[in-house]
């Protein structure tokens, strides 16, 4: 999975760009392909990204950097809710992540009042992106105690929202307080906290920025001079000695344009280095004569002299509202920022933390996006027998638009088209087949009759049977016209999977067909089996369910650690039920010694490390099981539904396993997203099939 670092904050004015630039510098030192993503953006130029692109020669298309603008995001949230907003942003993030080894995410800027809880939004986005969070806390014009409290609160906020907090950065603190704050924060948080002092040069506007903001005429000065930072403003209108005494390093001198003496005196002082200034701003739309300007240019080559029409004090009001920005046009600020970052941030420690293995946490949305991405990697054709069902049509549109797989929909073609048109659904790219009118019906009837001849099925009878959408779809899979099938939104489980048992049959290494659910909890995915097919498997069958479930888990990126569940743990229980689980566990160990398996084991000991430490200390599975095998359907079905309802888990499935080719059954209460997920899973299962990829009829 692509690594990502999410730099965010808790409010405006934290100088976060310093940290964002520093992290980018660090990443580009270690990784060849670094992408950038900004979830929400304001209208206008993005100076920081332009700096990153120029400095690090990024080839990334600027259009892919941004999730959406604030106005679009606000409208989407108002009309469809925050879940849809997050989902859309996650989609756009993954378009970037798939092309890079690591992604730097630039969090929101807390400048839009239409998102009053941006911290929670940033935390959720970070979790859904699978990103480690680097929160930045602003300390400008705050006491040491206030900064300490803000830093602790920020850590608790992001940590409490389930974020993987990489470290903390407290930025822009008063220089005189920096060491005290750093000492007081040391060892008080479970992650490093680096304290960076305020640097006036970073917040100071450049002379070029001032000229642009005031619409000033550039009378003298070159590009280097215009890039100087105006660290202070000094007003000159009195005698020259008074002005010279007031000069400070890096100041911009503001004086009426008719005071040639002050202009020459200031530039002479600059030339002598007592002190160097940023430039001179002339007011009242007056400029000294040619001779004075020639002298000025010789005294201080390159030093900017600007001219504006207004008087000094209105001009000053506008100047004090300006703040410097990091950008491609301010390379000096970039160097200052990097120097500050590298001095006060332990980059070796940060690099070690960034390079650490990705968190095992997987959110439901992350799992869903991984499914779609994996399905897209090798397109397969999935047949949907319930082509006239509204939910199936909506799911088909999603699958087609996102390029998850190729689709064939079954049913009366004109009825499908009319239903889609009524719903405003575009089925362009989908194949539509009416089994009753298909030219495949005859050959399918002959095939089915041959397969079921031992049951007395004739071609005439088979001709009627294969007009059923589920039988027709199953035969499409068997005969290579589709790679997999998904049905069940309006059909019973028996109606969906009976044709598969009769036609496709089980794999050579599978004793039975079984099922699993992917249980997507808040921070991980567990595999439950069997919760849908086998009522009371014996020890042999239970072992088969376990090994099949482990293979399915691995196929979908879940490292299999198998817990064979029972009402007792280890050797504490006895009786037929627990003996069955014990025997099945030994069969798994003998058949698949490469698998980690524990049993009999109770559910709490399987998933809770604290319980496992007491009941099965030293077990490689207890406390961290990822594949949970239930002893019977009664236990499994009730448990998955209980966890689904009480823990808010998303149950993806059932996913059938053990068939030669993939066929999956939907719940009749399946939502559109459930159908999308199941189709993606079916396509992924088909990718593992040794048979040739199916094509349209």
Curated annotation (Swiss-Prot):
Alphabetical list of Pfam families matching this protein: AAA_26 (PF13500), DRTGG (PF07085), PTA_PTB (PF01515)
EC number(s) reported in the record: 2.3.1.8
Pathway annotation from the record: Metabolic intermediate biosynthesis; acetyl-CoA biosynthesis; acetyl-CoA from acetate: step 2/2
Region (Phosphate acetyltransferase): 366-697
Protein name: Phosphate acetyltransferase
Family label: In the N-terminal section; belongs to the CobB/CobQ family.
CC annotations in GO: cytoplasm
Organism: Streptomyces coelicolor (strain ATCC BAA-471 / A3(2) / M145)
Domain notes per entry: The N-terminal region seems to be important for proper quaternary structure. The C-terminal region contains the substrate-binding site.
InterPro entries with a match to the protein in the record: DRTGG, P-Actrans_bac, P-loop_NTPase, P_AcTrfase, P_AcTrfase_dom1, P_AcTrfase_dom2, Phos_Acetyltrans/Butyryltrans, PTA_PTB
Record keywords, A-Z: Acyltransferase, Cytoplasm, Transferase
UniProt catalytic activity: acetyl-CoA + phosphate = acetyl phosphate + CoA
Enzymatic class: transferase
Record-level GO BP terms: acetyl-CoA biosynthetic process
Gene Ontology molecular function terms on file: phosphate acetyltransferase activity
Keyword Acyltransferase: yes
First-listed, main subcellular location of the protein, grouped into a coarse class: cytoplasm
